[in-house]
Amino acid sequence: MPKDYSRTLRIADQIQRELADLIRNELKDPRIGMITLTGVEVSQDYAHAKVFYTTLHNESDNFLVQNGLENAAGFLRTQLLHRLKLRVIPQLHFIYDESIERGVRLSQLIDEAVASDRSEKETDST
């Protein structure tokens, strides 16, 4: 089992590298623009791959990016077939990764709490 698990991780990493290259160099869809692939999770049977991404677009444009990636999934899968030496090329499922936005929000909340504590200490000391 551990050997199979590490193979799954290696395949996921390879798919992420190849997809990043394909999206950067081969896709001409203006809806996609600049995106960053943050991770790929491949199922144990290699039939499905969840591709996590972030984008510099605002939230209203995320729908367009998602739609563009879903439309390009067949093309990307075909290109992966030519680049990877696998019997099964997984079906690609693109998922917007909100973890970076959540991290920024948490950081802002922490900064606000620290600033609030400082202002309370300053008013208490005077």
Curated annotation (Swiss-Prot):
Entry-linked NCBIfam families: rbfA
Gene Ontology molecular function: ribosomal small subunit binding
Location(s), subcellular: Cytoplasm
Listed GO CC annotations: cytosol
SUPFAM superfamilies: Ribosome-binding factor A, RbfA
Keywords of this entry: Cytoplasm, Ribosome biogenesis
Cytoplasm found in the keyword field: yes
GO biological process, any: maturation of SSU-rRNA
Alphabetical list of InterPro entries matching this protein: KH_dom-like_a/b, RbfA, RbfA_dom_sf, Ribosome-bd_factorA_CS
Domain of life where this protein originates: Bacteria
Similarity comment text for this entry: Belongs to the RbfA family.
Subunit note: Monomer. Binds 30S ribosomal subunits, but not 50S ribosomal subunits or 70S ribosomes.
Translocase found in the keyword field: no
Name of the protein: Ribosome-binding factor A
Function per UniProt: One of several proteins that assist in the late maturation steps of the functional core of the 30S ribosomal subunit. Associates with free 30S ribosomal subunits (but not with 30S subunits that are part of 70S ribosomes or polysomes). Required for efficient processing of 16S rRNA. May interact with the 5'-terminal helix region of 16S rRNA.
Pfam families (UniProt xref): RBFA
